[in-house]
Amino acid sequence: MDALALIMTMAAYLLGSISSAVLICRLLRLPDPRKVGSNNPGATNVLRIGGKGAAVAVLLCDMLKGTIPVWGGYFLGIDPIILGVIAIAACLGHMYPIFFHFKGGKGVATALGAIAPIGLDLTGLVMLTWLSVAVLFRYSSLAALVTVLVTPFYTWMFKPQYTLPVAMLCCLIVFKHHQNIRRLLSGEEPKIGEKKLIEKNSA
């Protein structure tokens, strides 16, 4: 990895470490999303505690955290594999933010933003998959898991040179959802829009 790639990777992690959910909730005088609901600082939990407007703002900001560094690396001519490393760095920043005591979100929106520079056709198909599962089953985590499992295949269809880095990114997201998987299997996972609070130790 050359100096430029290393700088972009570090910048991606630092940008990812800016917790949109926490900052927007502070701005709107909402509860800290790390302490209420699912205890996850992401758009779905902000939807539960703050409504659609706040959730959309968090979603867009989280996506930009992935899009900006990857698009920047793309225009600088960085190799696809290193672009994958940059995307993973942005998601790691979101999941384990240095500015917020390493307590972050699941990385789904940031990963979507990181994939967006590959192409609008791929991005649209990924979003359609998530939306379809979410509408059918009303579980955000299930929609995310199904989507990340099929996204490497979608990538292979459109831009096969990016399949490996996208697969690496998807594996990271599945790992971050291990507690959601356990709650889905036990029937304890809250559905989209539910106000039900989850015990802090189950987040």
Curated annotation (Swiss-Prot):
**Pfam families, alphabetized:** G3P_acyltransf
Residues spanning the membrane: 4-24, 68-88, 117-137, 155-175
Q: What topology in the membrane does the UniProt record assign?
A: Multi-pass membrane protein
Subcellular localization is given as:
Cell inner membrane
Its UniProt entry gives the catalysed reaction(s) as:
an acyl phosphate + sn-glycerol 3-phosphate = a 1-acyl-sn-glycero-3-phosphate + phosphate
- Record's keyword terms, sorted: Cell inner membrane, Cell membrane, Lipid biosynthesis, Lipid metabolism, Membrane, Phospholipid biosynthesis, Phospholipid metabolism, Transferase, Transmembrane, Transmembrane helix
Functional pathway? Lipid metabolism; phospholipid metabolism
GO biological process annotation, one example: phospholipid biosynthetic process
| Domain of life, source organism | Bacteria
Q: What are the record's GO terms for cellular component?
A: plasma membrane
- As recorded in UniProt, its EC number(s) are 2.3.1.275
InterPro entries named in the record: G3P_acylTferase_PlsY
A molecular-function term among this protein's GO annotations? acyl-phosphate glycerol-3-phosphate acyltransferase activity
User: PANTHER family, per this entry?
Assistant: GLYCEROL-3-PHOSPHATE ACYLTRANSFERASE-RELATED, INNER MEMBRANE PROTEIN YGIH
Q: What does this protein do?
A: Catalyzes the transfer of an acyl group from acyl-phosphate (acyl-PO(4)) to glycerol-3-phosphate (G3P) to form lysophosphatidic acid (LPA). This enzyme utilizes acyl-phosphate as fatty acyl donor, but not acyl-CoA or acyl-ACP.
HAMAP family listed in its UniProt record: PlsY
Subunit structure comment from the entry: Probably interacts with PlsX.
Q: Which family would the database say this protein is a member of? A: Belongs to the PlsY family.
This chain's protein is named: Glycerol-3-phosphate acyltransferase
- Provide the species name: Vibrio campbellii (strain ATCC BAA-1116)
